[in-house]
């Protein structure tokens, strides 16, 4: 069966090996015996009290909403849910891209749910959240890449939750940047986040379909239009990059006026995904954090378990996050 979007069945989600077929650089499935052993600093303590976790999951199921925490198999799910924060994933749970580092399913998405913005706003109100992160799958099938739906969500959330802070973690809106950015003119977030993910020489393998310079330009153009709103980006380490590669990406981000940074360890979601090439020790994350601050980032959350939205509320308020 071909994996070209036009020949996919709408609503059918491809995972793991099915998702990885026909990407530019073939991913050879890992052998368990050759996997790098997870170091002690990557071990996570799970809370024995899952009451809050179950409450949030129930609220998501009730309103047919998705969290990237679950869809991307984030290691911090329990901690964040118990903290009372969640990153909501809009526009469905099927992505039109098939990045081999990501655990979100690929396929032909269903039509956009026009009621999702209101359902999302009501869920956030019921959960009494003060800070939310809204992200999405890539929707290359939509004329604006889903930007207007983001804006609709921001507007509806603010109507029911006037004191809330909203961070959006957007896709690259490739081929439709101006159209996408125009959608946010009346409904702005408190933080605009778009992840570069990795060094440019790894893009063909790690982010097929994406373009490093395009992503930098997206961050820069939003900042030019809205200089008072912080821009943010994130990177994974352990995919074959060097620390010098990372430092160059940080330099590029600052050259494009990005204010906030997240830097965390890549973890392999399944044997069919890209393998971890190295586990970066906490001391190196600390050093990279120091260099990031020296380059002029207002906030730099650098640590093995840091993810784009990990304690995003604390980072946005200026607190140190590791």
UniProtKB/Swiss-Prot annotation:
EC number, as in UniProt: 2.8.1.8
Residues given in the record as [4Fe-4S] cluster 2 binding sites: 95, 99, 102
Tagged with keyword Metal-binding: yes
Chain ranges passing through the membrane: none
One protein family per Pfam: Radical_SAM
UniProt record similarity statement: Belongs to the radical SAM superfamily. Lipoyl synthase family.
Name assigned to this protein: Lipoyl synthase
């Amino acid at each position: 069966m071909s994996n070209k979007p036009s020949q996919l069945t709408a609503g059918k989600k491809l995972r793991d090996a099915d998702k990885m077929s026909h990407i530019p650089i073939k991913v050879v499935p890992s052998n368990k015996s050759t996997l790098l052993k997870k170091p002690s600093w990557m071990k996570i303590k799970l809370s024995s009290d899952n009451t809050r976790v179950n409450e949030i999951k129930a609220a998501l199921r009730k309103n047919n909403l998705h969290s990237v925490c679950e869809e991307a198999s984030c290691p911090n799910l329990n901690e964040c849910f118990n903290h009372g924060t969640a990153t909501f994933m809009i526009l469905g749970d099927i992505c039109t891209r098939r990045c081999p580092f990501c655990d979100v399913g690929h396929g032909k998405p269903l039509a956009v749910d026009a009621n999702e913005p209101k359902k999302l706003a009501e869920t956030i109100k019921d959960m009494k959240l003060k800070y939310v992160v809204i992200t999405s799958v890539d929707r290359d099938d939509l004329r604006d890449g889903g930007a207007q739906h983001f804006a609709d969500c921001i507007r509806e959330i603010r109507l029911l939750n006037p004191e809330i802070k909203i961070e959006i973690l957007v896709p690259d809106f490739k081929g439709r940047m101006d159209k996408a950015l125009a959608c946010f003119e009346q409904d702005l977030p408190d933080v605009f986040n778009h992840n570069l993910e990795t060094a440019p020489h790894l893009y063909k393998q790690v982010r097929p379909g994406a373009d490093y310079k395009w992503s930098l330009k997206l961050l820069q153009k939003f900042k030019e239009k809205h200089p008072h709103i912080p821009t943010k980006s994130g990177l994974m380490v352990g995919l074959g990059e060097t620390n010098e590669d990372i430092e160059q990406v940080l330099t590029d981000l600052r050259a494009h006026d990005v204010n906030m940074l997240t830097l965390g360890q890549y973890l392999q979601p399944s044997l069919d995904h890209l393998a971890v090439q190295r586990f970066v020790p906490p001391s190196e994350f600390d050093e990279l954090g120091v260099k990031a601050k020296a380059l002029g980032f207002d906030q730099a959350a650098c640590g093995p378990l840091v993810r784009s939205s990990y304690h995003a509320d604390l980072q946005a308020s200026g607190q140190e996050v590791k």
